[in-house]
Amino acid sequence: MADSSAAEPTTGASSPPVASDENSTQIQPIRMPTIEEIRAQEVWNNCAVRAVTSGVMGGGLGLMMGLFLGALDNPITHDTMTARQQFVFTAKQMGQRSWNSCKTFAVMGLVFSAAECIVEKARAKHDTVNTAIAGCVTGGSMSARGGPKAACIGCAGFATFSVLIEKFFDRHT
């Protein structure tokens, strides 16, 4: 007869059983952040850095959208224009449209991000109320040239849009 105890290790310490269940999760030890990670987080907690970064990214998005939508435009060209003249005319229109979109999206990103960061720091909370307030500030300031009624409509519209986008992305994360 074969001895069954010979197959077992003789370390003296009994090891805990390993869970073979796929649903069980392994507990990971807590890892403290490094100095570089702490400094990087401190940089991103600065409202000016957030606002400028959002402004630059918004400007880039506006530039790309302006180029794309400018290319889709069907400008009124005269039959007397040569192909080269039509190309130059279309390129100028695309450039002008993309530059205008770039400026608009840059200001929008900068104002929204700065307002949200300032409200978040003042309230010491990260929730949807910050998004609504920042959306109101952004929408109101972007449409303020149209008068107080336009500013109120812009405030309500952009705040609603911002909250809906926030809820949509929170649901999918």
Swiss-Prot record:
Belongs to the Tim17/Tim22/Tim23 family. It is a multi-pass membrane protein. The keyword Transmembrane helix applies. GO terms for biological process: embryo development ending in seed dormancy; protein insertion into mitochondrial inner membrane. This is Mitochondrial import inner membrane translocase subunit TIM22-1. Essential core component of the TIM22 complex, a complex that mediates the import and insertion of multi-pass transmembrane proteins into the mitochondrial inner membrane. The chain crosses the membrane at residues 52-72, 101-119, 128-144, 151-168. Induction: Up-regulated after antimycin A or rotenone treatments. Residues 1-26 are annotated as: Disordered. The keyword Cell inner membrane does not apply. Keywords: Membrane, Mitochondrion, Mitochondrion inner membrane, Transit peptide, Transmembrane, Transmembrane helix. It is found in: Mitochondrion inner membrane. Pfam families: Tim17 (PF02466). Disruption phenotype: Embryo lethality. Residues 1-18 form a transit peptide. Expressed in young cotyledons, roots, flowers and leaves.
